Amino acid sequence: MAELTISAADIQGAIEDYVANFATDTEREEIGTVIDAGDGIAHVEGLPSVMTQELLEFPGGVLGVALNLDEHSIGAVILGDFEKIEEGQQVKRTGEVLSVPVGDGYLGRVVNPLGQPIDGRGEIETTDRRALELQAPSVVQRQGVSEPLQTGIKAIDSQTPIGRGQRQLIIGDRKTGKTAVCVDTILNQRQNWETGDPNQQVRCVYVAIGQKGTTIASVRRTLEEGGAMDYTTIVAAPASDSAGFKWLAPYTGSAIAQHWMYDGKHVLIVFDDLTKHAEAYRAISLLLRRPPGREAFPGDVFYLHSRLLERCAKLSDELGGGSMTGLPLIETKANDISAYIPTNVISITDGQCFLETDLFNQGVRPAINVGVSVSRVGGAAQIKAMKEVAGSLRLDLSQYRELESFAAFASDLDATSKAQLDRGARLVELLKQPQNSPMPVEEQVVAIFLGTRGHLDTVPVEDVQRFEQELLEHVRSSKEEIFTEIRESKKLSDELEKTLTDVVNEFKKGFETTSGESVVPDENVEAMSEDDVEKESVKVRKPAPKKK
């Protein structure tokens, strides 16, 4: 066995070396104590240096946000599982504000308001982060709305057009098709995405606030089937989430979208819906004992939405020329758009599309009320071809609605009024559109051209949609150059209009109504020339489909 020898000199040298390299390293850490907790809110004692909107760390890695800074305590919103937060637990400062990871890794994913994936497809690889509370672009950092954002919905693109960088409110009662309008708009961006041109591509962010889980799953499935998830991110705060998550969700979606906007890209963001967002913020404010105002909402509920929607903008060329277009949704009760939250958001946005229950129940879908709907800045972004054909559409429909109510009481009408009623009925039928079937703008121009130029006046109302579909199919198959010219030039020249009129008139000769009649009035038959004698001519008419 080896003998153990201890050298006093070695021990002395080790101690001297340790003392020479010793440095006092003190850490200052503020620790608070939970004095009460419940309903997603916690009051914390201590932490005298905490800042508003600062992240706090509760036991178990649960995060909270400091909202109320009182003299002796802090009111914090707990983000996540608040059931395990108890009185007496310690709370630490983080010195950070809320931020989320951002980047192209989010495309095609479903995340929660903290930016964490919840679709079971693994982690999201990102390198950048962005704070949730950021100042909106200033006046000098913006430019006017000039590029169209096509929704693929005839009634919107023709009457209340939307431009890139605009905020267009979609408002209406529950079950009137608000979400369907936004989903169709996202689906319509697929053609632009497939071009691969960054100037045409539009990335989409769908923020679901307080929606049922089945509704969010249905939207995701629709987008996947339409090939739209390749360029879409879903931020989900379902009804089962705490009020804190519902309050944060729109800001998370905006942070993800703003990253792309400042990178020179174009983004469409949908907030579905801001009524539930305001209600979640009201719940938080009341639990924090903030003084209630009108309808028990806190005094800063206007600022809650204005600072969110002001982030939507068309940036100046110096900042890359990116854009963020916002489609906030608001749910009304009994079509009352003069309530507190609806009037707030109407005053913030650049226009609104009002969806009406009565129209929806009559089968007019999308159920857009032309009289109340307006787009304040989108007209500058509308393509010239659509401006030319849809110029009188809004007036015609407004006159039709007015005459329709009058005609219910009048026994006889003059010829002009009858003509307006007949054309109005056909225009209403023309603007109907099935869900999840957005239409390219060049096809919309041709369809609206049929109605406003009087080509449908001889077509029975029940045959209008079939006439439109068969004509568009005819143009696609034999006169594709019409669509190509409208798509590329974005104009309807006199020559093109004449060509289109000739195509429509020729098509009408072979179209049969459901009752088997022609839509072309009979003309006086001229005498047959000698050259045509003993010659055969065959005319093919496409029969109307049999009624089931």
UniProtKB/Swiss-Prot annotation:
Q: How does it assemble?
A: F-type ATPases have 2 components, CF(1) - the catalytic core - and CF(0) - the membrane proton channel. CF(1) has five subunits: alpha(3), beta(3), gamma(1), delta(1), epsilon(1). CF(0) has three main subunits: a(1), b(2) and c(9-12). The alpha and beta chains form an alternating ring which encloses part of the gamma chain. CF(1) is attached to CF(0) by a central stalk formed by the gamma and epsilon chains, while a peripheral stalk is formed by the delta and b chains.
Q: In this chain's numbering, which residues are marked as the site (Required for activity)?
A: S373
InterPro entries noted in UniProt: ATP_synth_asu-like_sf (IPR023366), ATP_synth_asu_C (IPR000793), ATP_synth_asu_C_sf (IPR038376), ATP_synth_F1_a_nt-bd_dom (IPR033732), ATP_synth_F1_asu (IPR005294), ATPase_a/bsu_AS (IPR020003), ATPase_F1/V1/A1_a/bsu_N (IPR004100), ATPase_F1/V1/A1_a/bsu_N_sf (IPR036121)
HAMAP family in alphabetical order: ATP_synth_alpha_bact (MF_01346)
Which species is the source of this protein?
Mycobacterium sp. (strain KMS)
Enzyme Commission designation: 7.1.2.2
Can the keyword Zinc be found in this entry's annotation?
no
Q: Where is the composition biased (Acidic residues)?
A: 523-534
User: Which Pfam families does the protein's record reference?
Assistant: ATP-synt_ab (PF00006), ATP-synt_ab_C (PF00306), ATP-synt_ab_N (PF02874)
Protein name, per record: ATP synthase subunit alpha
Kindly list the organism's lineage: Bacteria, Bacillati, Actinomycetota, Actinomycetes, Mycobacteriales
User: Cross-referenced NCBIfam families, in alphabetical order?
Assistant: atpA, PRK13343.1
Q: How does it sit in the membrane?
A: Peripheral membrane protein
